[in-house]
Amino acid sequence: MKQNALDQAARDAGISLEYINVNGEKEAISDETKRALLAVMDDPQSAKKSPLPPVAVFSGSGKRQLTPQGSGVYSWQLQTEKGKSLSGELTAGEPFTLPGPLTQGYHQLTLSKGKKSWQTRIIVAPRRCYLPPALEAGEKRWGALVQLYTVRSEQNWGIGDFGDLDQLLVHLAKRGGDFVGLNPLHALYPASAGFASPYSPSSRRWLNVIYIDVSQVADFQQSAAAQKWWKSAKTQKALTKAREAERVDYEAVMALKLAALRHAWAHFQARDSQSEEHHSWAAFVREGGDSLRYQAAYDGIQLERQADKTQQGGWPAWPEAWRNSQLPEVQQWCEQHEEEIAFWQWLQWLAQQQFSACWTHSQSLGMSVGLYRDLAVGVAEGSAETWHDPELYRLKASVGAPPDRLGPLGQNWGLPPMDPHVMQARGYQPFIDMLRANMRDCGALRIDHVMSLLRLWWVPAGETADKGAYVAYPVDNLLGILALESHRLRCMVIGEDLGTVPQEIVSLLRKSGVFSWKVLWFEQEKDQRYRAPQDYPRQSIASASTHDLPTLTGFWEQGDLALGEKLGLYPGDAVKALHQQRAAQKQALLDALHQAGALPARSQKKAEKLTMTPALNRAIHRFLADTDSALLGLQPEDWLGMTTPVNVPGTVDQYPNWRRKLSKTLEEIFADKEVNALLKVVSEQRQSGQKGK
């Protein structure tokens, strides 16, 4: 392929020919990378064989026009979502205005000529995402940002669960809190529970069954076999060990829960098939369709294959005949293991029932947001989703990030990207299904790496991340669908837009009503001064930190830098500069606290002489509570003065990511006078500044 033809093919496929590097300079993408990415993509030209694209999205109330390709006259028929049918004729090459008024939703336009017909999905969307009435009225709310697996309690089985979540909602509501923000609850790998990253899931449509509160499952309570197992010395010993462990022992917890739930499942099966629970479960299975069936089959097959240590990495490690859900061997297994599939479907039903109950409870407590979920940027290569739908995912590429100063070879996240051309060919149904699954039963959805709506850095298989390129996604269409589903499910949207984000996506997100994320550590002006509380944008959520960053105490004591040096994450000459930079950040933050009146005038003015104390902790929380952001998210780790991070980006085996528990139980946290005093300050401060921009 000649140079001009190669570049044009790359442009047609959405592959950027250059990008802005860490030095602010344009850097060209190599021809090798262009060819490699073109080879793994679906052909974007296939959609051009139809007179109209497979889908068209119209946002707001402007003109809704399409210009059909080809020649001559077509007959058209428009079937609205509500069942109304309209028809007429149009001429190729001339703008065709859709008959109106069309309500917001999903409609179907069919063109026909002779014996041929073509269909286009018409999506009519609002311009902006949903906003809860309380926030629309100018109220400022706060809540807790919780990694659910870290929660300790006197009742759980060694990992935070939906029972703990329910209690957390009660505790927060009593203290003026409005929501609990959660880590991704996506399905992981019950058969390989040690693969615990919530950001490398098996499916973004289904839940992680390890969060089921087994003690609250009726069939566990009513099963004689389950109760005998539960009361045995062996079970109680294993439970105590898992509960008292400093880190989450995923394998031990999952083994306990699966053993208990097998007993409960046997009891459920023996019950009257006409019971309300059986009808509810059957309806759930019908609604879940093939997606749920093959998620369940995948979990069952993976568990069966765990005995062979060479097959523990998911389907890529399985024999060739098992690497796709539609292969004959897999279909035969499914036919022979219907009961096993039903068991895993039942676990998904239990998880959904319990999570839904938490949402309902949050609403009865008067919370305007209640729960917010987190949507990971992708699924792992060896996931149930890629196994069941390999056409949608480009398995010979991976998502990552271009080189920066701390990562000269870039980042490879090991997540195969969705092909934007396949998404479009399917009328964006995979994206719609994913949003619906994650917006269900919650008041807000956080989208991790929200820049993925605009572009993703694709890395060809076998290459380092510096050999990648940006691939464009249909951002206007995706934002329109996001707004439509947001309104339908009454779920506001938060975009994780940290780091270097193109101004293009920043403006689009703001116009679409997507909330920005403002992390205290990053809110410094060019002169290094921290942004004043009143200058935070109202359309944002503020926080001190995130799961990828040091805790408040860890930041102040610079423990994250010491840990990074120990783990070999920083070049030797960078560590000293990082400590100097941190010292300057601390001084700038202390200056900001004094300027905002968050600290008494007589208190220490030099950061180098100040250790983290309860008074300083309260001052930082008071500063955050005073920000004009409509939402404020606080981490329990910071209430407790914890120093160790829950995740260290850039590590795999060097650090026990996703395993560090909170230092106190839920019961102890909310009986702690310091914690209650701090939360009282936060709640009062938020209520005192309700009016804003």
Regions of interest found by a model, annotated:
Residues 1-50:
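Long, contiguous interaction/targeting segments characteristic
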Residues 41-71:
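Extracellular ectodomain segments of secreted/surface proteins
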Residues 64, 72-141, 157-171, 175, ...:
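Extended acidic/polar, glycine-enriched regions
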Residues 131-134, 166-174, 359-364, 431-445, ...:
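Short amphipathic alpha-helices and their capping/turn segments at secondary-structure boundaries
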Residues 142-148, 153-158:
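Active-site-adjacent substrate/metal-binding segments within catalytic domains
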Residues 191-352, 378-631, 637-639, 653, ...:
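Alpha-amylase-like alpha-glycosidases and glucanotransferases acting on alpha-linked glucans and related
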Residues 344-376:
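Conserved, well-ordered alpha-helix/loop/beta-strand core segments that scaffold catalytic motifs
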Residues 633, 641-691:
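Structured C-terminal cap/extension of enzyme domains
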